[in-house]
């Protein structure tokens, strides 16, 4: 029996533990061949596949060793609304994204520099899982995994206020001094024309 026909027999689920199994090119004595046939006939040395075997060649796939992805196949989508007070709470947002849950971050309770750091951190995690991100309002951001489609029909990018239009050498305005809302890094690059 050639190697290819033996592979076909294994894949097709044929009983490959028959006398053709010994047709390898080994030098054997005739009395060893007779002993092997008698053991095979009595079922002594060779084990036959049973129904309790984890390697069922002929039956369907049991799926007992398959680990599902979190959130796949669930009937409803989850949205987590988070109002963090410090950057230390950001890993929870990343974990929710990894579990294929949408996260809305309301960063109004954070200091502006910490809020900017938090937005950049969660945006990086969202990018790593091929997710989507959207600025919903002032200091409010939506981060969604790749299984969620985010569309925005009422947002006009040209009419959106931007803090990038200000010169870096000029004196900051009063809105920047009082803790204006953070602008995510991807908004800065879009407005900058890059």
Curated annotation (Swiss-Prot):
Matches recorded under InterPro entries: Cell_div_SepF (IPR023052), Cell_div_SepF/SepF-rel (IPR007561), SepF-like_sf (IPR038594)
Keywords for this protein: Cell cycle, Cell division, Cytoplasm, Septation
CC per GO annotation: cytoplasm
BP-aspect Gene Ontology terms: division septum assembly; FtsZ-dependent cytokinesis
Metal-binding listed as a keyword: no
Region (Disordered): 35-54, 159-194
Subcellular location: Cytoplasm
Keyword Amino-acid biosynthesis: no
Main subcellular location of this protein, as a coarse class: cytoplasm
Assembly and interaction partners: Homodimer. Interacts with FtsZ.
Role: Cell division protein that is part of the divisome complex and is recruited early to the Z-ring. Probably stimulates Z-ring formation, perhaps through the cross-linking of FtsZ protofilaments. Its function overlaps with FtsA.
Family of this protein: Belongs to the SepF family.
UniProt-listed HAMAP family: SepF
Entry-linked PANTHER family: CELL DIVISION PROTEIN SEPF
The protein's name in its UniProt record: Cell division protein SepF
Species whose genome carries this gene: Prochlorococcus marinus (strain MIT 9303)
């Amino acid at each position: 029996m050639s190697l290819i026909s033996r592979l076909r027999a294994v894949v097709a689920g044929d009983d490959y533990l028959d006398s053709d199994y010994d047709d390898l090119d080994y030098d054997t004595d005739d009395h060893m061949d007779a002993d092997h046939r008698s053991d095979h006939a009595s079922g002594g040395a060779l084990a036959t596949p049973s129904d309790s075997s984890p390697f069922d060649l002929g039956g369907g796939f049991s799926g007992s060793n398959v680990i599902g992805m979190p959130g796949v196949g669930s009937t409803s989508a989850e949205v987590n609304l988070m109002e963090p007070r410090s950057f230390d709470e950001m890993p929870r947002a990343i974990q929710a994204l990894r579990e294929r849950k949408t996260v809305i971050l309301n960063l109004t309770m954070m200091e502006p520099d910490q809020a900017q750091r938090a937005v950049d951190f969660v945006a990086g995690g969202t990018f790593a899982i091929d997710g989507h991100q959207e600025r919903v309002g002032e200091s409010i951001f939506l981060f969604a995994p790749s299984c969620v489609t985010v569309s925005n029909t009422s947002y006009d990018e040209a009419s959106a206020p931007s803090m990038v239009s200000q010169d870096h050498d000029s004196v900051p305005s009063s809105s920047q001094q009082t803790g204006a809302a953070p602008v995510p890094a991807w908004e800065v690059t879009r407005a900058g024309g890059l």
